Amino acid sequence: MECMAVNDISYGREAEIWPRDYSMLARRVQFLRFNDIPVRLVSNNARIITGYIAKFNPKENLILASDKPKGNKRIEVKLESLAILEELSGNDAFNLSLVPADGFNLQQYTPSRRDYFSICNKCYKQGVGIKIYMKYGQVLTGKTTGVNACQVGVRTSNGNHMQVMFDWVSRITSSDYAE
């Protein structure tokens, strides 16, 4: 039996740039840090840190998360392990939670090295929502706010804004897509 190549943009294309260029994400991280906006960080293995960005080192692709803005109790978060960066609104009720860095940064899955720019850009231009299937099983839905080679911005139904890293995505479809 012949093996056919999948030509479906919802499964992404091979990334042109590797390792990833996090410069666009770095700008967002700095904004969140300077404005003391609470965040939810989700790792590639579904571990969650809810707190603040206390410090950011763009040269090392490293976020230091804390339970307080500019706090001293810091957990190292490697951008290479980050699946989702969600901005929490001031109206959100949330519990601060920190997990050990070695558990958060543990790479349970191999990075996909896939680029989902085409499907995200198409949904953005058509004004339709997207549905994101994460490698660890979570399914996210929302409206795309922009896309680049390594992540997509998504506004969720509760109004929160998140950045979803392509390396931990298995598929992206439009929200109106039905199999």
Swiss-Prot record:
Keywords: DNA-binding, Repressor, Transcription, Transcription regulation
Keyword Metal-binding: no
InterPro entries, per the entry: Flag1_repressor
A Pfam family that the UniProt record links to this protein: Flag1_repress
GO molecular function, one term: DNA binding
Function of the protein: Transcriptional repressor of the FliC phase-1 flagellin.
Name the record gives this protein: Repressor of phase 1 flagellin gene
Organism: Salmonella typhimurium (strain LT2 / SGSC1412 / ATCC 700720)
